[in-house]
Structure formats: C-alpha cells, structure tokens
Amino acid sequence: MNSDSSSVSSRASSPDMDEMYLRDHHHRHHHHHQESRLNSVSSTQGDMVQKMPGESLSRAGAKAAGESSKYKIKKQLSEQDLQQLRLKINGRERKRMHDLNLAMDGLREVMPYAHGPSVRKLSKIATLLLARNYILMLTSSLEEMKRLVGEIYGGHHSAFHCGTVGHSAGHPAHAANAVHPVHPILGGALSSGNASSPLSATSLPTIGTIRPPHSLLKAPSTPPALQLGSGFQHWAGLPCPCTICQMPPPPHLSALSTANMARLSAESKDLLK
C-alpha cells in the first residue's frame, strides 16, 4: 500500500516537474535570445559608432586637402606675381645704371685729364668731384675776365680821349669854335716861317681842329703814366688809342713840320757855335 501510494504520488508529481522544467527552459531560451539580440544590437551600434568617426575623419581630411590645394594654388599665383615684380624691378634698376654709366662716360669725355689707354678709368665719385672743381675754376676765370673787361672798357673810356674838351661828335658847335693850343716847336716853326710860308696865323685853328693835339703836348709836366685802371696803363709818349686821334695828319702839315725841324736844328747848331 505504501509502495503504491508512493508511486502514485511520484506519478502525480511528475507532470509538475515537467512543467517546471519546460518553464525554466523556455525562460532560459528567451533570456538567451534577448541577450543575443542585445549583443547584435550593441555590435551594430558599435559598428555604426566606428563607422561615424571614420567618415568624419575622411570628410575632415577631404576638406583639409581641398583647403591645402587652394592654398597651394594661391601660393603658386603669389610666387608668380612676386617673380614678375622682381623681374620688373631688376629691369628698371638695370636701365637706371646703364643711363648713369652713359652719363658718366659723357662727362669723362669733356674732363681735362689724359684719355690714354694707360690711364685708369675714373670712378663716379672722382668724376663728379673733378667736374665740380672744373666748373668752379671756369666760373672764377669768367668772373675775373668780366671784371678786367669792365675796368678797361667800362667807365674808363673817357680817359682814352685827349684833353678835357670832348670830341666834335658830341658837341659840334663847341668843337667848331674851340681853338686848341699848338706845340711850342710847331708854333716857333710856323712863326719863323711866316715870311716864306704862304700859311697865315688864321689857318692854325683850322689845322688844330683837323687833328686834336695830344694832352701831353699841352702839359709838359704830365706824369709819366696815366692810370686808366688796374689792368691798363697809358704811358707817356704813346699815341692815343682812340680812333679819332689815330687820323693821319694832312700832307702839307707833315711836309712843313719836316722842313722847319731841319731848319731849327741848323739854327741851334749855329747858336751853339
């Protein structure tokens, strides 16, 4: 009886065990399925997370590459512009130096120094200093020449003319009425030869007006030299340099003076005896 009851109880209890086993197995299977599902989701999310930084990095790299290419193009353009600017500056400087060398060569050609092949070419500074000194020397020489010419031909031209009475060109009425004194020798010769000479005393003023006498003939006590300026001296005994005083004497006056001078010399010899 006891054995039967135990078997019955064991049989009665066996469906519960099966149900419990099945429930536990189903729960484990469901849990495993959830875990596998969660693992797949997490792996998918991890893959997505891994893919996202790669894409961002690739995008950033592409953007940086584009910017670097733009910068390189801009840099290349700027280098070309700088090269063109350098070429323009070098050409302008080369032209300036060429023009300067041509100007210096032209200045050296007119400088007063030896142009032989053995002479070393002057530098630019030496050429400019030599040109400055040469210009200063020419300027001082020109000023000195102007001063000398002004002293000779400037305000001292009146000293060239004879006597204190002006020429007949300035005052024709006064020159026609002026009576110039005659040299003592010429006056003595004319007075001694009045008996034999057809000339009269009234003709003497006419002779004097033809050729004005020298101031030395009027004043015997004239100093040996008349200062006409610092660069010119009019020595006694020399003829007047003006054109009016250089007129030749009349032929009858020159013949008369020669004959009378010979006559006076003979008379002086007789007096000495």
From Swiss-Prot:
PROSITE patterns: BHLH. Residues 84-138 form the bHLH domain. Residues 1-72 are annotated as: Disordered. Weakly expressed, mainly in non-neural tissues. Pfam families: HLH (PF00010). The keyword DNA-binding applies. It is found in: Nucleus. InterPro entries: bHLH_dom, bHLH_transcription_factors, HLH_DNA-bd_sf, Olig3_bHLH. One of its GO terms (cellular component) is nucleus. Keywords: Coiled coil, DNA-binding, Nucleus, Transcription, Transcription regulation. GO terms for biological process: negative regulation of transcription by RNA polymerase II; regulation of gene expression; spinal cord motor neuron cell fate specification; spinal cord motor neuron differentiation; spinal cord motor neuron migration. Its main location: nucleus. Gene3D superfamilies: Helix-loop-helix DNA-binding domain (4.10.280.10). Residues 1-14 have a biased composition (Low complexity). Residues 69-90 form a coiled coil. Residues 37-47 have a biased composition (Polar residues). One of its GO terms (molecular function) is protein dimerization activity. Residues 24-34 have a biased composition (Basic residues). PANTHER family: BASIC HELIX-LOOP-HELIX PROTEIN NEUROGENIN-RELATED, OLIGODENDROCYTE TRANSCRIPTION FACTOR 3. May determine the distinct specification program of class A neurons in the dorsal part of the spinal cord and suppress specification of class B neurons. This is Oligodendrocyte transcription factor 3. The gene is Olig3.
